């Protein structure tokens, strides 16, 4: 029945009756109104409109997926009869596309041989496949305290300027380059410069093969922050559709989203433009439903897996804000970046007490890893509790065992720092990839007291524990 409708309504023409910013009302014959989410094309223009509401009397309310400059009442619009469809499959590899799947890298058109609608249902419950396999990142603090699962969902939470994008770039560097599968990067409402830097970095490392694009390992979809809200709202779905198509071919896919908060923000803008009543803190009333619809599609099936890493901006460093709070519920691992840790000069500024992972379970990571991680967290928690006493009375008033706990905690804190490959330009020190076994060995030695004789500065910005011993000799 839906197919018949599509055939009847495709090609039907309507005319613009109202245009307020990105919201455009179009009037169609009453018996041939487009369906919600149908894509409409403006005559003589590349602009696409997406139907959001049916107002009655043949009028539909749409969101413009592009600039609405120059629109006026009376312009003719035709119904495509289908939702927005984008190219998928091998043709997208090595390319940069916009929300509609059009190329923006000046390397010719993208083949439309395989296309898919950006609006799809999440896989059925019986198709899903849980994963217990760990994904090693080479970043000590993440591998130890909040390990990632292959086929899991990870969130990088942080306020402005604490290192979400740098952490994500390092994860891409460590995982995507060594990863045998494919990657999809969705830039949602972020800076154009970051998208440009990412593309050139991928080209330099060979992940994007400029000589033979189809041999590339990454597809990129960008809707940067100067785009209209409709583009920023849908660009995550475009990226996800490409990732789903690779997964359904039986591949293991890495799906990077930077930044999921901008997706929420675009939803807020669209909701306000459509005249919906705002909910808490001005967010759209459909916040949980919109987030759920996106996140439920990012999942692994029995055919292939999607491992997703999402940066989440935290407004005013408030993790209880409705947007990050709604995102938390969908994730397997949460990496929380802290401004307090960044202010100490410790990068990556991951808070080991706030970050969590469902994989940190002795049955998944093993007893040794679990005990070391909990030992590290216990020592850091004790230091946190003693800080007020130290501030008022000083270190001398502490009991001997507390002095020892503080000394070890400060060493752990510094050992959690690590030079990144992507930050070599800024730090001047070569990046370090630390295998999980080395990470566990190093922290086990500190917690057990085998490094009590070393100065704490020996642990700052090193890779393995052996490097800390080497650095201690130079310091001494």
Swiss-Prot record:
The record's catalysed reaction(s) read:
ATP + H2O + 4 H(+)(in) = ADP + phosphate + 5 H(+)(out)
Q: What CDD domains does the record point to?
A: ATP-synt_F1_beta_C (cd18110), ATP-synt_F1_beta_N (cd18115), F1-ATPase_beta_CD (cd01133)
Q: Which residues form a coiled coil?
A: none
Q: Give the source lineage, highest ranks first.
A: Bacteria, Pseudomonadati, Pseudomonadota, Betaproteobacteria, Burkholderiales
Q: What does this protein do?
A: Produces ATP from ADP in the presence of a proton gradient across the membrane. The catalytic sites are hosted primarily by the beta subunits.
EC number(s) recorded for this UniProt protein: 7.1.2.2
Q: Which UniProt keywords apply?
A: ATP synthesis, ATP-binding, Cell inner membrane, Cell membrane, CF(1), Hydrogen ion transport, Ion transport, Membrane, Nucleotide-binding, Translocase, Transport
The superkingdom of the source organism is: Bacteria
What cellular-component terms does GO give this entry? plasma membrane; proton-transporting ATP synthase complex
HAMAP family, sorted: ATP_synth_beta_bact (MF_01347)
Q: Which sites bind ATP? A: 158-165
Family of the protein in this entry: Belongs to the ATPase alpha/beta chains family.
> What protein is this chain from?
ATP synthase subunit beta
The record describes its quaternary structure and partners as: F-type ATPases have 2 components, CF(1) - the catalytic core - and CF(0) - the membrane proton channel. CF(1) has five subunits: alpha(3), beta(3), gamma(1), delta(1), epsilon(1). CF(0) has three main subunits: a(1), b(2) and c(9-12). The alpha and beta chains form an alternating ring which encloses part of the gamma chain. CF(1) is attached to CF(0) by a central stalk formed by the gamma and epsilon chains, while a peripheral stalk is formed by the delta and b chains.
What Gene Ontology molecular function terms does this protein carry? ATP binding; ATP hydrolysis activity; proton-transporting ATP synthase activity, rotational mechanism
The membrane topology term of the UniProt record is: Peripheral membrane protein
- Tell me the compartments it is located in: Cell inner membrane
Paired cysteines (S-S):
none
